[in-house]
Amino acid sequence: MPVQHCLTYLFARHHGGTFLIRIEDTDRKRHVEDGERSQLENLRWLGIDWDESPETHENYRQSERLDIYQKYVDQLLAEGKAYKSYVTEEELAAERERQEAAGETPRYINEYLGMSEDEKTAYIAEREAAGIVPTVRLAVNEAGIYKWNDIVKGEIEFEGGNIGGDWVIQKRDGYPTYNFAVVIDDYLIKISHVIRGDDHIANTPKQLMVYEALGWEAPEFGHMTLIINSETGKKLSKRDTNTLQFIEDYRRKGYMPEAVFNFIGLLGWNPGGEEEIFSREQFIQLFDENRLSKSPAAFDQKKMDWMSNEYIKNADLETIFNLAKPFLEEAGRLTDKAEKLVELYKPQMSSADEIVGLTDLFFSDFPELTAEEKEVMAGETVPTVLNALKEKLEAMTDEDFQPDNIFPQIKAVQKETGIKGKNLFMPIRIAVSGEMHGPELPNTIYLLGREKSIQHIDNMLKSL
């Protein structure tokens, strides 16, 4: 869920800044083919537009900037602020295991510690002769204090001695690590504000070390609260099956992008007050980074669906019908009454794919009644109501069979039988649709058709 993208977009647009998309792809093991295109499509679908991106500018993919990173790696090596490390992954793992067994906090111990210059030269020659490709590590000032005034959380401070020792800025394959590359990119592209999740807080002191080593001024940082599952109270996980966390899921199910943007925009930020439905323009106007929440934001799928339903109810029929069309077509239900069916169920929908289940009544066998529905149909006045309505519907011509004419027939049954309220409407609804609740009854009867409505009532009477 691209919460940080959304809020960074609002920040940039509110302040009249430049919003850009940069592809951070230095971790080749996690590289996903076609992932970039998919991410950009999802942002476009949400209505997030940008000023600069790999589509319009060169070198906006980190994998295309290796020569730029190499320049600064070489600079730090030449200045003695970084060094080549020949420790193997196996040696690092063994040392980490030893430290954990001894109850120590795992950290990298400088491999050259205690070596003379001659010993160091011999060590490097031996390692290179063995074909070991080095990494490059930043020499950490362990006595240094790295602090910043976080936009969201206020002042945060780290001691240089508590970040795990000298850390890798360039991997064996020549690619930079994330914490090194983003500093180079942010500085050269003139990024003024970095807004991201608070899982990046531990990365910030490392990035400040790089800014310090290169003599550059750091941007402002803001770390947004983590997102928790509203049902479990725990950090949102990909394994949480009760939530839709990926934009692809919302697109696939036929949610309105405006609703998803609205929901995301309120995760970790709110403008104050009780209002929860905002247009994109209102979001941009109202956005205030000082109102970014310090407390965890709850991802509530029910609230997302409520919000989506509000958008669908207020959207024009053509928009929702076009959203629902693919689902109706796939289910073989794109009939001449399809648009009327969408209009009928539009007030109940949270996503367009729900139209298939909602319209089962019109295309499937009559559903099995629940215990509660059977209890309603056991009422002593039910046969009277159903027989009276059946007679009214049988007397109607096909030309007269319209929603505006069906409701007066139901009212006539009320007048003739003296039965009203739920004792009148509930048995009719259950007999016709097999459900206790649903859209307007005259519209349901009309779309079901006169013959099928009479057949359902007749079958119900026989079962009583």
Curated annotation (Swiss-Prot):
UniProt keyword Metal-binding, yes or no: no
Location relative to the cell: Cytoplasm
The organism's superkingdom is given as Bacteria
What start-end ranges are recorded for coiled-coil regions in this protein? none
> What GO MF annotations does this protein's record show?
ATP binding; glutamate-tRNA ligase activity; tRNA binding; zinc ion binding
- Pfam families xref list: Anticodon_2 (PF19269), tRNA-synt_1c (PF00749)
Please tell me which stretches of this chain the record labels as motif 'KMSKS' region: 235-239
Q: Which reaction does this chain catalyze?
A: tRNA(Glu) + L-glutamate + ATP = L-glutamyl-tRNA(Glu) + AMP + diphosphate
Q: Which GO terms describe its cellular component?
A: cytosol
Record has Protein biosynthesis as a keyword: yes
Q: How does it assemble?
A: Monomer.
Q: What is this protein called?
A: Glutamate--tRNA ligase
